Each structure stands twice: as structure tokens, then as C-alpha cells.
Amino acid sequence: MYTTVVYQVKSKDVKAAAHAIAIGQSIGNPTIRNGYENNDHAAEISYVHNDEVVIKYKNKNLNRPTDVAQLLCTIQGGHTDIDIIDECRIRDIFVDIPEYKKIWHHPTDRPLVGGIIKPKSGITVSQLTEIVERMCAGGIDWIKSDEILSDPSYLTLSVRAEAVAKVLDKYRNVMYCMCVNGDPVHFLRQRKHAEDHGLGIHTNFWSGLGIYENPSVYQHFQRSGIRILTDERNPFSISWKVITTLAIMQGVDSIHAGMIGGYYPGDEQEVFDSLYLCRDHNRIATLSCGMNPETAKSIKDRIGNNWLAAVGGWLHEGDITENVRKMRKAVES
């Protein structure tokens, strides 16, 4: 079994660079060999043409194929520091996607409406519960904390989770995702708090791209800041399509795919690539950044029903309940 990676490589000798990647990222130093190396574990170069290099990595070198942290260390690791490689972008990846079991059974006859809690920090428990109540009263489907609001010392995640869960006792089919950003031990503790209260989670990639393997809790992948990894101006970048694939492989339930229209500065094609991957694997693609009823209606006309409109700032201008109703009307029309 293999994981196949498609690279875009800039080098004075692309074939030599391909050899350096394949050998250096599997069994040993590409130029200094020893008698202990086992070629049965070596990565295989399957294609080199112009700047495109395709390499097949053997999954037996990983603990498991979904071990994303070690996989990334393998496919975009030490070769980025050698002089023969000027640029090396991962454009695509081909992996086996495990069977997926949906946790949240949501409406499918229209785009979903999601709300993002504001303010990002400084919120009180009473403000939080009032905002959640108002969103739910308007007919919200999905709510998430902002990625800035994880487990601040002034108002811990455990306190907020308990308060939110009490409100949602009246709205059993609303999915609420607590932000559980944190270092590994802290992340696990926060995820347990959310799970114990019947809530979902969302995590920014800084907490680790390989932390999502937990089928017992709803998990949302938040992309904020991801262009540090995906921007093509980074000579050793990883495409957003690849990141989306790795998130799906781990079993995430929804992915912040990006934005169509609004103030998004990147190429819409990468958003569509992520959207189509989510649809192919029965995951929810969320679109945000400047979302409002007019934008949502325009997007629905372009791509149909299978996505979630995550609304931030606009939802909090005026009456939250009424604004949710306006969003519902826009996606139902």
C-alpha cells in the first residue's frame, strides 16, 4: 500500500532532486549509502516530467496510513533543506479514505446556516448564552466559537461548555463547536469537556494537522491562517487541496473551505477544489468571510444546496434572531 504525492519541483536537475526526495525521505542519505539500508522500504519515483515529480511512499513505514503528523514529516521534510532543491510544492496527494460515519444528521434540502460567536474575546457567560439562545430562536443549524476564543483563563472552556449545553437542551439538533485550540495535552482535556457536554469541536491547524482522529465527537477543521502553509509564494508550500484531503482522511465532519466572493484574496479554484472533495466524501464544506443573505443567495445559485453558510460579523448587526431568519429565508428561496 502506498501514499502517492505529486510535487512541483524547481531544481537545476529535477531528476536528481526527485531521487534526493525519494531516498532521503524514506531510507537514508541520498548520496551516502550504507549496508544496512533496505530497499523494500524505499519510496518509488513513478513519474518525472518538466517540474512535476510523482513519488510513491510505502505505508508500512508509518504506524498507520492516517498518521498525518508522521506522513507530513515524510513527504515535506528534510529535503527542503538541501541545495539541489530550490522549490518543492506538494500539489496533490492520493490516499485511502477510511469509511466515514456521519455524527450529525442535518437538513439536506437547503444550505445550512451557521453562526460565529462574537466578540472573539472578552465575552461573559450571560452574553454567550443570550447570543446562543437568539441564534437558536432564529433557526440556526450550526454555531461555532471564534478560533480566538479557546480556553482563556478569565472564562474557561469547561464553564462555557456547561452553559452552552444547558441552552441547547431545548435545541437538540443544533450543532455547537467549541474551539479547543491548544498544545496536545491541553487539547485532549478540552476535547473531553466538549464531548462530555454533547458538543462538537473545532480546531485551528496550529494545534496540529493530525489531531482529528476521534469518531465519537463532531469535528470541524478551521482553516484560519492556513495560507502560511498553502500560499504558492512559499517555495515549500502544501496546496489547500492536499490539506483538505488529509483532514477528510482523518474523519473530520466539516471543513472551512474558504470563501466564494466577499473579501477572499486567493484563487477561488482552491475553494472549489476543497468544496468538491467535501462533497465527494460526504463532508460539510463551510464558506464564510463576509457572509450575508445576499452573498448566500448568490452562492446557492452557483453551487446548489450542499454547503454551510457561516456568518460572522453581519449576524451581530442588530437583532441576531431576525438576522438568522433572514439567512434562512435567503437559503430557502
Regions found by a protein language model. Give the residues of each.
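Catalytic cores of alpha/beta
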Residues: V125-V132, G182-D196, S237-Q250, G290-N306
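N-terminal capping/small domains of soluble enzymes
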Residues: M1-C136
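Conserved anion-binding
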Residues: G198-Q269
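Active-site mouth loops of central-metabolism enzymes
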Residues: V6-K12, P111-T129, M175-H186, L229-S239, ...
